[in-house]
Amino acid sequence: MHRYRSHTCAALRKTDVGSNVRLSGWVHRVRDHGGILFIDLRDHYGITQIVADPDSPAFKVAETVRGEWVIRVDGEVKARADDAVNTNLPTGEVEIFATEIEVLSPAKELPLPVFGEPDYPEDIRLKYRFLDLRRETLHKNIMSRTKIIAAMRRRMTEIGFNEFSTPILTASSPEGARDFLVPSRIHPGKFYALPQAPQQYKQLLMVAGFDRYFQIAPCFRDEDPRADRLPGEFYQLDLEMSFVTQEEVWETMEPVMRGIFEEFAEGKPVTKVFRRIAYDDAIRTYGSDKPDLRNPIEMQAVTDHFAGSGFKVFANMIANDAKVEVWAIPAKTGGSRAFCDRMNSWAQSEGQPGLGYIFWRKEGDKLEGAGPIAKNIGEERTEAIRKQMGLEDGDACFFVAGLPSKFYKFAGDARTRAGEELNLVDRDRFELAWIIDFPFYEWDEDNKKIDFAHNPFSLPQGGMDALENMDPLEIKAYQYDLVCNGFEIASGSIRNQLPEVMVKAFEKVGLSQQDVEERFGGLYRAFQYGAPPHGGMAAGIDRVIMLLVGAKNLREISLFPMNQQALDLLMGAPSEVSPAQLRDLHVRLAPVQKS
């Protein structure tokens, strides 16, 4: 017999009754029933019940074992009595009568339990992550992660993509975040960088003629902590294709992403055909470029109904600035003063002066609008708003006014808040859509200059003609995101593969041809030797998994994550290094300036 086991703790069934077996695993719990000891033995695969009665030669050792000790058990498989069958376990019809127990490794008293869903501080859980990972939910999440990534690989290979690994030590390049830098010992004063993404390498693979590339790519960004991203590193399904339009990228990847969701959604409906929503429409309709389309609320502009009206706050704003707009946020079933007051209080807690509203109710046979706004704009305008928004008795509508670029995020948050409070959001489905036609440039208010809105390597719609003749802030990019349930889960673009167009695009943000050659020399040179039209995307694996398993944050689907302060509490990173190591790297530490 094998030294440690003949079966796993999930393998035994009623057909094994009478067999002598050997199992090894962790003591999940021990129960004493009238002098008979029952041990739930757990391994990676499942749980089997072990029985040790006082007549068993294993009983003496069984009395000593405690939770999370690692033991080996020899014994005979017996059928449980009918009233003792555990239908919650695959092994629930049998139990092992122990003849020998060997303690392979005792365990100290645990700093946190490894069963159930303990409400322990996250830093304790991360410090003892090897224990936390024994919990059933977290263990299951990690195994789901493995299966989802394997399915991604399988699906990409099936449609003709080749997996290539790109370098981890590379050159620093500005891609929207700080680089993690690695000092070179061999080249004093110079640094490598960990890749924020394999962007340039995958484009170089297209120039090299490989046609279809993908990899499960680690990406490293030295960003301030964010709720929707793990500090330090994350993984993406990275891909690139030659001789494609953006339509062909969508047509290729939509079945892959839909298939992944359908395979792991556990029966929840998944969008069959992904909608394509222009960025400008997404902002105006949902107040977000990653809208949760499970929320049926769609905003509309109602500026004309307030122009010249008796509601002077809005009317004066409209009269004084032609760019001012009023947006309406319809709230089906929200037509109670209590709900409207709650929304108004929430808006004030968000730093807003308030949130104007109208709600409709039947007065006899007549449907009337109520609230200060309805009173000020009059019955005719109130009715026109109701008809435009498709509202009825018991419904409400909220209003925001000003410059859309200033208020759209708040309007989107109000839409989300109303949808959640009124239970309008169907949480048991996955709603996916493409957001397309992103702006190529944006105004950087901090530095008072034009900057790239997204990927600087994207192709501007209209090419060189647009760059030379259009207002930069009006230029759109062949840039697209895939969104699901309020999260951006993928982003991509058709690339700018002509060197002269690339240089012109960077000139608009203040970089010269020399700057381009210095910062992106490899890519710039490659484009001068025959570069095919190409494009691709990258899907955030961590976010996809988080959505599919229903985890509340990204740390619940990652093996050994850092905490929100970018500290690895298990391994003690980042840590100080010895003076000798610093000398080898030609690095001298400057005193930390106290703020």
From Swiss-Prot:
Residues 199-202 are annotated as: Aspartate. GO terms for biological process: aspartyl-tRNA aminoacylation. It catalyses: tRNA(Asx) + L-aspartate + ATP = L-aspartyl-tRNA(Asx) + AMP + diphosphate. The keyword Nucleotide-binding applies. The record marks H33 as: Important for tRNA non-discrimination. Its EC number is 6.1.1.23. The keyword Cytoplasm applies. SUPFAM superfamilies: Class II aaRS and biotin synthetases, GAD domain-like, Nucleic acid-binding proteins. HAMAP family: Asp_tRNA_synth_type1 (MF_00044). Belongs to the class-II aminoacyl-tRNA synthetase family. Type 1 subfamily. NCBIfam families: aspS_bact, PRK00476.1. Homodimer. This is Aspartate--tRNA(Asp/Asn) ligase. The gene is aspS.
